[in-house]
Structure formats: structure tokens, C-alpha cells
């Protein structure tokens, strides 16, 4: 409780342990996490009913239910690898861009962050979840940090600062966007009720909003799934 989340080591070796090995465990850091979970090529997911919008899902390790939430709302989804460039995405002329969840430290993805920074200048509607929330924040000039204790589980309460309502959300992250570093034009819109950390941002200099939690959570909670409806309305208004 005093030291926060720490690395662990499962071993059959009996003590005393080698000091060098213990130091390696202590300093272990997962690298290139997104590369291990992103798709290798573009996959097209058709809308469930008559197509109304074409969406690019920038896939950093997306949960399948993100795609389901979009296709059931008449969206054709182009599921793209994390290494796709801003130029390639804009050439597809999507109605909106979805930044998915994914693993690891957001700051370990400088190339992706740079491509997101480029694409923000196009002014396309954007919706980010979890890692996508963090990556867009960094691209816009904010900073992230490792939490002493990450948020894990399907019972995390978040408060909508616009309405005052509290929702129960599903979360699985160990990094946070540091609210004191938010750039001009970025408004914190959700906070975690337990520890007060940033859980959502709306950008007033572009049509974009992001959340740290998972509104697409399957099998729930479903409290915030209507954020996908907000994204749809944003594209209609664009």
C-alpha cells in the first residue's frame, strides 16, 4: 500500500535470490505493447443496417465491442493498424475517427502520437477510449503519468462534471492524463469518484472527446454506452 503497484516474479527458485535478477525484475518495463495487439492489415466491418457513416478505427488493441457499438449504429468501420499514417487515414475521407483502447505506457508510442497530432489539424470528429484518450491528450500537449494504483474492474464510479450524474464504469489502466497539464481548449468532463483522477476530456478547438473508461464494456456495465450516440450526433453536426 505504501509503494504502489510493483512488478512480481513467479519462480521455482528458492531464496536467497540473485541480486542482479531481482534488479532486472524491479526495472522490467513492457515495451512495444501496442505492436503485439494491433491488426496486421485493414479490415472492413459493414454496418448492421443501411450505412450512414464511414468510421476509421485506429486500432491500438481495440475491444471487439467497440466495433459492434459502431456497426449497430449504421457505421461502416475500417479497422486500421496502429502504424497507419495520418495521410493514409485522411485519404479515406472518413466521417469520424475512433481512437481505441490498448496496452502499455502511452508515452511509449511517439510515432503514433505524431500521426495523431497531424490528423487533429484536419478537424475530423474524434472519439477516444482508454489509451486513445491518453494518446490524443499527449498529441494536444498534455502529459500522462503512472498511477500509484491503477483502476481495475467493472465497478469504478465516474462523475460527469457537466450534469453531476455518477455512472459505474469498467476500467483497466495504470496511467492517467494529468489534469494540470491540459492545454487551452481542453476541458475535463469526467472524474473518478474514488480518487479524483481525470476520466474524460472534451476539446473545444476541434470536434473531439475522450474517456478513460470503457463505455463499450461487455458484458457491462452499460451506463455510459450512449457516448457512442454522442459521437454519432457529433458527426451529424459536423
Q: Which residue stretches match the model-derived regions?
A:
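RNA-binding accessory domains that recognize and position tRNA/RNA substrates
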Residues: 1-93, 106-108, 218-220, 226, ...
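General small-molecule cofactor/ligand-binding pocket signal
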Residues: 78-80, 145, 189
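Active-site-proximal beta-strand elements of phosphoester/diester hydrolases
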Residues: 54-59, 169-170, 209-213
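Flexible loop residues that form catalytic
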Residues: 102, 206, 216
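Cysteine-nucleophile active-site neighborhood
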Residues: 96, 100-176, 220-235
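Hydrophobic anchor at the start of a short beta-strand
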Residues: 77, 126, 208
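Catalytic beta-strand/loop cores that center a nucleophilic Ser/Cys/Thr
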Residues: 164-206
Amino acid at each position: 500500500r505504501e509503494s504502489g503497484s510493483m512488478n512480481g516474479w513467479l519462480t521455482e527458485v528458492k531464496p536467497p535470490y540473485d541480486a542482479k535478477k531481482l534488479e532486472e525484475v524491479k526495472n522490467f518495463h513492457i515495451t512495444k505493447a501496442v505492436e503485439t495487439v494491433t491488426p496486421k492489415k485493414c479490415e472492413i466491418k459493414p454496418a448492421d443496417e443501411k450505412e450512414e457513416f464511414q468510421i476509421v478505427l485506429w486500432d491500438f488493441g481495440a475491444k471487439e465491442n467497440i466495433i459492434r457499438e459502431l456497426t449497430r449504429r449504421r457505421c461502416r468501420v475500417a479497422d486500421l493498424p496502429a502504424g497507419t499514417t495520418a495521410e493514409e487515414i485522411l485519404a479515406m475521407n472518413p466521417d469520424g475517427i475512433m481512437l481505441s483502447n490498448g496496452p502499455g505506457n502511452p508515452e511509449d508510442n511517439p510515432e503514433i502520437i505524431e500521426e495523431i497530432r497531424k490528423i487533429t489539424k484536419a478537424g475530423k470528429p474524434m472519439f477516444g477510449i482508454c489509451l486513445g484518450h491518453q494518446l490524443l491528450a499527449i498529441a494536444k500537449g498534455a502529459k500522462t503519468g503512472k498511477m500509484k494504483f491503477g483502476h481495475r474492474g467493472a465497478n469504478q464510479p465516474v462523475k460527469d462534471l457537466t450534469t453531476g450524474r455518477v455512472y459505474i464504469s469498467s476500467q483497466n489502466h495504470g496511467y492517467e492524463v494529468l489534469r494540470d497539464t491540459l492545454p487551452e481548449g481542453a476541458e475535463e468532463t469526467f472524474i473518478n469518484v474514488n480518487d479524483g483522477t481525470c476520466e474524460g476530456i472534451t476539446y473545444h478547438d476541434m470536434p473531439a472527446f475522450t474517456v478513460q473508461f470503457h463505455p463499450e464494456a461487455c458484458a457491462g456495465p452499460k451506463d455510459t454506452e450512449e457516448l457512442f450516440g454522442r459521437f454519432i450526433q457529433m458527426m451529424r453536426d459536423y
